[in-house]
Swiss-Prot record:
Family label: Belongs to the glucosamine/galactosamine-6-phosphate isomerase family. NagB subfamily.
Organism: Corynebacterium kroppenstedtii (strain DSM 44385 / JCM 11950 / CIP 105744 / CCUG 35717)
One Gene Ontology biological process: glucosamine catabolic process
Protein name as catalogued: Glucosamine-6-phosphate deaminase
EC number: 3.5.99.6
Keywords: Carbohydrate metabolism, Hydrolase
Length: 258
């Protein structure tokens, strides 16, 4: 695992875009996350598309999760959210963007089918991730199996409450999601986790320096052969080995890719 520390959230977004751009140019399969943390990165990639001609025409993309019970065109579905925030502003083909089928009659089978679809596409080359204050990634809350596949998960009551602002009322918030599991996420060839803000500092410390444990689902990144964690200074405040991470990056060989 490589820990990369930048001064501001804006610099985190720029660094992430720098890492993603070669993958885009090579026609890689991208793993996309929703949420506020990746937005700056998506905006920078959109800017490079508009101003520098960065093309996504040869890319495929897979979303991490989807609400169960919402149609894809619902304004709050994660498919519609990623369209609104990112993919409708670039030249990726609509049919090249996939999300779990939250309307399937058999949700268990839909999870298995999604994992199979990812495998049939050759796997995800680089997966963008955020992290929750409790260490969750995707909707893999504390207690999730470290080798779990794409499956149904029940939202935490706090998540339902937090997401109510996007709906007419809390009663309208779906209680279930279909999410890539930690095992599915681990199959991506490169994991790129972004975190900003002091409220993420404890979770970042747990994922990077704590034990690998279901209590901090993101700690499974310690087992991955190519995981990059980009954080701002505020999110780095709890790291015991912060100075070493800075030293290691400054002395990174020129040939070594992030």
């Amino acid at each position: 695992m490589e820990i990369v520390i930048r001064k501001t959230p804006e610099q985190v977004s720029l660094q992430a875009a720098d890492i993603l751009e070669p993958y885009v140019s090579e026609g890689a399969t991208l793993g996309l996350a929703t949420g506020s943390t990746p937005l700056g990165t998506y905006q920078e990639l959109i800017r490079r598309h508009n101003e520098s001609g960065l093309s996504f025409a040869n890319n495929q993309a897979f979303l991490l999760d989807e609400y169960v019970g919402l149609p894809r065109d619902h304004e709050q579905s994660y498919y519609r959210t990623i369209r609104r925030e990112f993919t409708e502003h670039i030249d990726i083909k609509d049919e090249a963007v996939s999300s779990p089928d939250g309307l399937a009659d058999n949700i268990d089978e839909a999870g298995r089918a999604y994992d199979e679809r990812i495998r049939n596409a050759g796997g995800v080359d680089i997966q963008i991730l955020g992290i929750g204050t409790d260490g969750h990634i995707g909707f893999n809350e504390p207690g999730s199996s470290l080798n779990s596949p794409t499956r149904l998960k029940t939202l935490h009551p706090q998540t339902v409450s937090d997401n109510a602002r996007f709906f007419d009322s809390e009663d309208d918030v779906p209680r279930h999601v279909l999410t890539q599991g930690l095992g599915t996420i681990q199959h991506a060839r490169h994991l790129l986790l972004l975190a900003t803000g002091k409220n993420k500092a404890a979770a970042v410390q747990a994922l990077a320096e704590g034990p690998v444990s279901a209590s901090c689902p993101a700690s499974v990144l310690q087992l991955h052969p190519h995981a990059t964690v980009i954080i701002d200074e505020a999110a780095a405040t709890c790291l015991e080995h912060k100075e070493y991470y800075i030293f290691a990056e400054k002395n990174k060989p020129e040939w070594q890719r992030y």
